[in-house]
Regions:
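Residue-level detector of beta-strand structural context in well-folded domains
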Residues: 250-252, 274-276, 308, 315-317
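Low-complexity, glycine/alanine/valine/leucine- and proline-rich hydrophobic stretches
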Residues: 296-336, 343-344
Length: 368
């Protein structure tokens, strides 16, 4: 999905990058750089670094990659390398130079890193805390791509928490790493306006794409040391946190207003997703059961409603919500099934009535 579909860029760098002496000088030796990243979005940054390092006048080379150890993924539960490790291997990068410590403070790993004598480390969603012993190794420090406008949304889930809050503006920051979480001086940033329908996986991918461009643009100043001088300290009085998402946060409560639920669906898309319970009433048999499913895609309804009845209007399931608002649900997913449209789900109900689930009442539990 093209970034122009979701974003209107209206502010670029923290300070415009001017041609530095390093860009015109001739490097007798490429400076070793170590990249740290793990999920699929990190491969965008690694790809940008690979491409830049292959240029004839490149000032650096990717000397090693640090990533999470292999883990069991997908339905087969086979041990698989991280997406970053797999991407590097597919590009022909030496497996001996792909380091996978359980923790970044392991003595053996730190000894290996020291032997590489990196000038700079770059992190992009690595997933491990970097101890002081690590941060002291690279001569020029460690620089992180963080998908928020620091000091806003420091922590593990900046994109998700920003969408959950319904922000109209977000961005990506390039900052030096210090011991305190996401608190280092900011080298540069870019701001974007956020579309009201974009979901976390798409926003995350787009921010890391823009972050990779920002990194390549700023690398000359980082490598010649001028970035450290221009980097701006963060305003601690404006700092906010973006804590890791817990699985039990996935449940939706329709007592909340529709816009709150819509933002949560967008924020938790991918993982952990958003779940709901409804009462299925079969008038023929007189049975009332509880049905659980995931809500995949929504929009805020334009009509007010007070009823507890869930109905189907045009292309959406209409859920009554708090404050006389309504949430239009466009896609759902039943347990073990594929994502389906609201229309297909409604047809599958075969005339049964759907009502909001009330925790104060007791019904037998089913998952259809």
């Amino acid at each position: 999905m093209a970034s122009s579909l979701f974003f209107r860029r209206f502010c670029c760098l923290h300070s415009a990058t001017s041609p530095s002496s390093s860009s015109s000088s001739v490097f007798s030796k490429k400076k070793p750089l170590v990249f740290l990243g793990s999920p699929q979005v990190s491969t965008t940054v690694l790809d940008a670094l690979f491409n830049a390092s292959f240029a004839a006048d490149a000032a650096f080379e990717v000397a090693a990659i640090v990533t999470q150890p292999p883990s069991r993924r997908d339905r087969g539960r086979k041990m698989m390398p991280s997406p970053v490790a797999q991407y590097a291997l597919d590009k022909g990068f030496s497996s001996d130079l792909i380091l996978t410590p359980e923790k970044a403070g392991e003595d053996k790993f730190l000894s290996t890193l020291k032997a590489l004598q990196p000038e700079l480390c770059i992190t992009a969603a690595y997933g491990n805390i970097l101890p002081t012993k690590f941060l002291n190794i690279p001569a020029l420090g460690t620089v992180n791509i963080h998908p928020s406008l620091l000091p806003l949304y420091r922590g593990a889930a900046p994109v998700q928490r920003a969408l959950q809050d319904g922000v109209k503006e977000t961005g990506v920051s390039l900052a030096f790493t210090v011991r305190a979480l996401d608190a280092g001086p900011v080298i540069a940033f870019e701001k974007f306006e956020v579309d009201e329908q974009i979901k976390a996986p798409d926003l995350l991918a787009l921010l890391f794409l823009e972050g990779s461009k920002l990194l390549i643009r700023e690398l000359p100043s980082i490598l010649d040391g001028s970035a450290e001088k221009k980097a701006q300290p963060q305003d601690e009085s404006k700092a906010t946190k973006a804590p890791k998402i817990a699985p039990d946060e996935a449940w939706l409560s329709f007592d909340q207003e529709a816009y709150v639920l819509h933002n949560k669906v967008r924020a938790f898309a991918g993982w952990p997703g958003t779940r709901a319970k409804v009462v299925v009433a079969d008038e023929k048999s007189g049975c009332h059961n509880i049905l659980e499913f995931k809500i995949i895609t929504t929009r805020v309804g334009i009509q007010e409603t007070q009823a507890d009845e869930i109905c189907f209007v045009k292309d959406a399931l209409l859920f009554p919500c708090g404050g006389r608002t309504a949430l239009e649900v466009l896609e759902v997913q039943l347990p073990g099934k594929k994502v389906v449209s609201a229309g297909a789900f409604w047809n599958g109900m075969q005339g049964k009535r759907l009502k909001k689930f009330d925790e104060t009442k007791h019904f037998s539990h089913v998952s259809v």
